[in-house]
C-alpha cells in the first residue's frame, strides 16, 4: 500500500469549551495558537460525557473513559451503563447467569443470596441493580431471598446508608419477597488490601451467623450511628429472629449473586467463598459446598463463578488497525497520563502492538502541580517533535496533562499558566507537522480548566465538567481536507474513524463511530 499521510493526534487533557465567566481559565489565558487554529481550520465540538462515552446519563467524563472511546472508535459502555441498558431493554431479566441462580434457588431448601454495596454511589455498585435483581426474584417466585447489605459512606455521604436501607426495605415490602440477613460496612466486606481479618468478620457473619447481632437492619445502623460509627465502618452484624437465630446464612448448595460491578473490592470475599482448596488467608468458620455463585462482572478470570456481564473487549482499536497494515506509530505523555495514551487508548491492552513505540516522560516531583503548572509539557513536546520530524511514524499520539492536573488543584492563576504553556507547545507541534506535510488533529478527552468556580459564587470547583471539547482538523494547504465541513453532534468515538478517513484506510466493522468529515473538497 502507498504510505498514508502522517497524522498527529494531540489530546489536550481537561480542555473544553466552557462558559464565558470568571472561572474559565482557558478563556482567561492568552492562547494565540488555539485561537488561530479555531478561526482558520475546520472545527466542531464533541460530547464527552454521559451516554456519549458509555457512562450513565449526565455523568461527567474522565481520562480513562475518554481515551478508551478515542482509541476504540466506538462507544465503550462502562459496566454500570451496560447493566442499566440491560434493565431498560429487559435483557437483564433473561440473563443466563441469573437464570442459573434462580434455577438453583428453586430447589427445596435453597436460598438465593444477594450480596453487595447498597446506595447510589455508582462506583462499585448501584442500588437500582439490586432492586432489579429483587424484581427478577419476585417474578420467578423465589421464596427465600436473603440480602447481605454492605453500607458505603465513602462514595456516598457518611450516614446516607440508613436512607438507602429504607429504600431497600420498602422495595422488599412492595415486592413481597426477601429480607435483609446481614449488614456490614464496606471497610470489612470490601477490603482490597489483604487485611483479611476484616474480610473474616464479614465472612463469619454471612456464612456462619457469627458476630454482633440485631433484631432488624435499621437497628444495626441506628446503633452504629449512636456509637459514632458511620456507614463505611459498621461492624458486620447478623440479623436474628426473636429466638436469636440468624435469619439466613449461606449454606451448602445455595445460590449467591454478588452484584458489585467493580472487581477490586469484591475479590477477597469472593475468593473466601469459592476457593475449595488452598485458601489460607484466614481459618473459615465453615465453607459452603456446591455453591452456585454469580458475579455481576468478571472479578478474576480463574474464579469458579458465573459472570453475568462479561468484559467488553475492544478488539480492534485504532492502534491495531494501523499495526495490522504495517504502519508505525508513536505514543507519548508524561507519567500522569501515560496509561491513557497506551493501555486505555489501545482498548485495555498493556503490550504495544507491533510497530508501536512509546515514550514515558516523567512528571515533575512536586507536592502539587500548581507549583509547576508547565509540568513536563515542554519535554513531551520535545519527544513528539522528534518523532514527527523523523518521518518514521504514520501516527503520533500526544497528551498534554496540564489543563486537567493543574485544574484539579483549584488554583486559577496556575491553571491559566498551564493552559498558556500547552498553547505554546501546541505551536511547536503544529510547526513540526507542517514541516512533513502531515495532518494535525487537536481534541480533548473531557473538560476541567474551563470551569474552576461554581457559577455565581467564589467557591472553587476542582472536578471535571460537562462541556463539549474542540475538534480541529489542520490539513496541509494542498490537501483536499483543507476546507472540509465537519458535522455537529459528534462524540469522542468519532475521532478514530475520522483519522482513518484522512489516512485513506478502511474502517473496521467493530468501529461504529462515524467520521466527522461530511463534505470533502471537490477533486478529492
From Swiss-Prot:
Mn(2+) 2 binds at residues 13, 63, 445-446. Binds 2 manganese ions per subunit. Substrate binds at residues 124, 154-155, 186, 192, 262-265, 337. The keyword Iron does not apply. Pathway: Carbohydrate degradation; glycolysis; pyruvate from D-glyceraldehyde 3-phosphate: step 3/5. Pfam families: iPGM_N, Metalloenzyme. GO terms for biological process: glucose catabolic process; glycolytic process. The keyword Isomerase applies. GO terms for molecular function: manganese ion binding; phosphoglycerate mutase activity. It catalyses: (2R)-2-phosphoglycerate = (2R)-3-phosphoglycerate. Signal peptide: none annotated. CDD domains: iPGM. InterPro entries: Alkaline_phosphatase_core_sf, BPG-indep_PGM_N, Metalloenzyme, PGAM_B_sf, Pgm_bpd_ind. HAMAP family: GpmI. Belongs to the BPG-independent phosphoglycerate mutase family. This is 2,3-bisphosphoglycerate-independent phosphoglycerate mutase. It comes from Thermomicrobium roseum (strain ATCC 27502 / DSM 5159 / P-2). The gene is gpmI.
Amino acid at each position: 500500500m502507498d504510505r498514508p499521510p502522517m497524522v498527529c493526534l494531540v489530546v489536550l487533557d481537561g480542555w473544553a469549551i466552557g462558559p464565558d465567566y470568571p472561572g474559565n481559565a482557558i478563556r482567561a489565558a492568552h492562547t494565540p495558537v488555539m485561537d488561530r487554529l479555531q478561526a482558520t481550520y475546520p472545527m466542531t465540538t464533541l460530547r464527552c460525557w454521559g451516554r456519549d462515552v458509555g457512562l450513565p446519563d449526565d455523568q461527567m467524563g474522565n481520562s480513562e473513559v475518554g481515551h478508551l472511546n478515542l482509541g476504540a472508535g466506538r462507544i465503550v459502555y462502562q459496566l454500570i451503563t451496560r447493566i442499566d441498558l440491560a434493565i431498560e431493554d429487559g435483557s437483564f431479566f433473561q440473563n443466563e447467569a441469573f437464570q442459573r441462580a434462580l434455577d438453583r434457588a428453586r430447589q427445596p431448601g435453597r436460598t438465593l443470596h444477594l450480596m453487595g454495596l447498597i446506595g447510589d454511589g455508582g462506583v462499585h455498585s448501584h442500588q437500582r441493580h439490586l432492586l432489579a435483581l429483587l424484581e427478577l426474584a419476585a417474578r420467578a417466585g423465589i421464596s427465600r431471598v436473603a440480602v447481605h447489605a454492605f453500607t458505603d459512606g465513602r462514595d456516598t455521604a457518611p450516614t446516607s446508608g440508613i436512607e438507602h436501607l429504607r429504600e431497600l426495605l420498602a422495595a422488599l415490602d412492595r415486592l413481597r419477597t426477601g429480607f435483609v440477613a446481614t449488614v456490614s460496612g464496606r471497610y470489612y466486606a470490601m477490603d482490597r488490601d489483604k487485611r483479611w481479618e476484616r474480610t473474616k468478620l464479614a465472612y463469619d457473619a454471612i456464612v456462619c451467623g457469627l458476630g454482633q447481632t440485631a433484631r432488624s437492619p435499621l437497628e444495626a445502623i441506628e446503633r452504629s450511628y449512636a456509637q459514632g460509627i458511620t456507614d463505611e465502618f459498621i461492624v458486620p452484624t447478623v440479623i436474628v429472629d426473636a429466638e436469636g437465630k440468624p435469619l439466613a446464612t449461606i449454606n451448602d448448595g445455595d445460590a449467591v449473586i454478588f452484584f458489585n460491578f467493580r472487581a477490586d473490592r469484591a475479590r477477597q470475599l469472593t475468593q473466601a467463598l469459592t476457593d475449595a482448596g488452598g485458601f489460607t488467608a484466614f481459618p473459615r468458620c465453615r465453607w459452603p459446598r456446591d455453591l452456585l455463585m454469580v458475579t455481576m462482572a468478571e472479578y478474576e478470570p480463574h474464579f469458579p463463578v458465573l459472570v453475568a456481564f462479561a468484559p467488553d473487549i475492544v478488539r480492534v482499536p485504532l492502534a491495531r488497525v494501523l499495526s495490522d497494515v504495517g504502519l508505525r506509530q508513536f505514543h507519548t505523555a508524561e507519567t500522569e497520563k501515560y496509561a491513557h495514551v497506551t493501555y486505555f487508548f489501545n482498548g485495555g491492552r498493556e503490550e504495544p502492538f507491533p510497530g508501536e513505540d512509546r515514550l514515558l516522560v516523567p512528571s515533575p516531583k512536586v507536592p502539587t502541580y500548581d507549583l509547576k503548572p508547565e509540568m513536563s509539557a515542554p519535554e513531551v513536546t520535545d519527544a513528539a517533535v522528534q518523532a514527527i520530524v523523523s518521518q518514521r511514524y504514520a501516527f503520533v499520539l500526544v497528551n498534554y496533562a496540564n489543563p486537567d492536573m493543574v485544574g484539579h488543584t483549584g488554583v486559577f492563576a496556575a491553571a491559566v499558566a498551564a493552559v498558556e504553556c500547552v498553547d505554546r507547545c501546541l505551536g511547536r507541534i503544529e510547526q513540526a507537522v507542517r514541516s512533513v506535510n502531515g495532518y494535525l488533529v487537536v481534541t480533548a478527552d473531557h473538560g476541567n480548566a474551563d470551569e474552576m468556580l461554581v457559577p455565581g459564587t467564589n467557591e472553587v470547583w476542582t472536578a471535571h465538567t460537562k462541556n463539549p471539547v474542540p475538534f480541529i482538523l489542520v490539513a496541509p494547504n494542498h490537501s483536499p481536507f483543507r476546507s472540509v465541513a465537519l458535522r455537529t453532534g459528534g462524540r469522542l468515538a468519532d475521532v478514530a474513524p475520522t483519522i482513518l478517513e484522512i489516512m485513506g484506510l478502511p474502517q473496521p466493522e467493530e468501529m461504529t463511530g462515524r467520521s466527522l468529515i461530511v463534505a470533502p473538497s471537490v477533486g478529492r
